[in-house]
Amino acid sequence: NLWQFENMIMKVAKKSGILSYSAYGCYCGWGGRGTPKDATDRCCFVHDCCYGKVTGCNPKLGKYTYSSENGDIICGGDGPCKEVCECDRAAAICFRDNLDTYDRKTYWKYPASNCQEDSEPC
C-alpha cells in the first residue's frame, strides 16, 4: 500500500516519497500522461504500468509483507499483493539509482499542461 511504499522509498532511496515523488514530472503522483520527463519520472511511469498489471490486490490499499536487509528489499509471502511489493521495490530501487539526475527545481509540481502528449504504451 502507499504507506508501505513510502517506507520502502525511505529505506532504499533515503528520501521521503511524499515530499520527493508525490508531485514530480508527469507520472509521479496520482494519474499520469504524456512523456516521462527524466529518469525519475520514467521510474514512476514504469511503476504505474506495473500497478496496471496487478490482479487481485488494490495497489494503493492492499498490504504486503517485506523485509529490508542491507538496504535491499525482500518481498515475502505468496499473496496477491506480492506483485504490488515487487512493483514498489523496483520503483524504490529506480529512484535510488537515479538520484544523481533528480531535478526538483524543474520537475516538482510540474504543470499538467506540459504533459499533454499521448502516453507511450506500457
Swiss-Prot record:
The role this protein plays is: PLA2 catalyzes the calcium-dependent hydrolysis of the 2-acyl groups in 3-sn-phosphoglycerides.
Look up the record and report any one GO term of the cellular component aspect: extracellular region
Cofactor binding summary note: Binds 1 Ca(2+) ion per subunit.
Which chemical reaction does it catalyze? a 1,2-diacyl-sn-glycero-3-phosphocholine + H2O = a 1-acyl-sn-glycero-3-phosphocholine + a fatty acid + H(+)
Q: Where is the active site?
A: 47, 88
UniProt entry tagged with the keyword tRNA processing: no
- Which example biological process does GO assign this protein? phospholipid metabolic process
Species the sequence originates in? Protobothrops mucrosquamatus (Taiwan habu)
Which residues are Ca(2+)-binding? 27, 29, 31, 48
PANTHER family cross-referenced by the UniProt entry? PHOSPHOLIPASE A2 FAMILY MEMBER (PTHR11716), PHOSPHOLIPASE A2, MEMBRANE ASSOCIATED (PTHR11716:SF9)
Full protein name = Acidic phospholipase A2 1
Looking up InterPro entries in the UniProt record yields: PLipase_A2, PLipase_A2_Asp_AS, PLipase_A2_dom, PLipase_A2_dom_sf, PLipase_A2_His_AS
Q: What class of enzyme is it?
A: hydrolase
Kindly state the subunit structure of this protein: Homodimer.
Cystine pairs annotated here are: 26-115, 28-44, 43-94, 49-122, 50-87, 57-81, 75-85
- Give this protein's Gene Ontology molecular function annotations: calcium ion binding; calcium-dependent phospholipase A2 activity; phospholipid binding
Q: Mostly located where?
A: secreted
